[in-house]
């Protein structure tokens, strides 16, 4: 049985840990509020650019662009958005499990795929397992701007355009609410499943439809990556807040149990001392 001093030491240590997890919970809650606003405010832009792209690509006959055309798949690219830090529950493990399953099911050789890792946890996971990481970025801000991700997003889209990849998939955690995030797989390129959000709008093209698509389609694909990042950041903060709340609650339960054990041990020690005193007094009579 643990001594009173050991139990008291554990109580003190657990209280300090609970203070840390509570502080992390509050910080994550504040970050979540802003990240959720960022993700939601980006939705109208994405809806509008999708409407324009759909109208330009589908509204006129003869639209042609490599990003709109499926081709024989020799190599697949996986854009995987994870966090730079842990302590976020199953946020990272769920998405990495999903990507690993997809790679295992679709490919026989590492030559058939490559990973673009956004986030340190994902990067380290793939490198450790010998999975080829062709591009990576870590250390992104908790509230990233488009400029932070534009470089790697542009490089990734260019890798499809120049034939390095024949298709691109985007993996991220979609934010539903504070306690629910969903691992999402989205086929980024080619854009073969464009659907008009409403009635197609007619446009007059100057200089030409193809030249407009040449500029617009890469921007649209890059925006999809940025939208996934914003969604992922909101999910990360929500997952970390939930994990830290659970840790704080567990610490409180542990403190209560340890306090009960301490009181019982102290009571037993006092009872033992009284028994010894009474026994000693009886022996002197």
Swiss-Prot record:
One of its GO terms (molecular function) is ATP binding. Its main location: membrane. The keyword Ion transport applies. CDD domains: F1-ATPase_gamma. Keywords: ATP synthesis, Cell membrane, CF(1), Hydrogen ion transport, Ion transport, Membrane, Transport. It is a peripheral membrane protein. GO terms for cellular component: plasma membrane; proton-transporting ATP synthase complex. One of its GO terms (biological process) is proton motive force-driven plasma membrane ATP synthesis. It is found in: Cell membrane. InterPro entries: ATP_synth_F1_ATPase_gsu, ATP_synth_F1_gsu, ATP_synth_F1_gsu_CS. PANTHER family: ATP SYNTHASE GAMMA CHAIN, ATP SYNTHASE SUBUNIT GAMMA, MITOCHONDRIAL. F-type ATPases have 2 components, CF(1) - the catalytic core - and CF(0) - the membrane proton channel. CF(1) has five subunits: alpha(3), beta(3), gamma(1), delta(1), epsilon(1). CF(0) has three main subunits: a, b and c. Produces ATP from ADP in the presence of a proton gradient across the membrane. The gamma chain is believed to be important in regulating ATPase activity and the flow of protons through the CF(0) complex. Belongs to the ATPase gamma chain family. This is ATP synthase gamma chain.
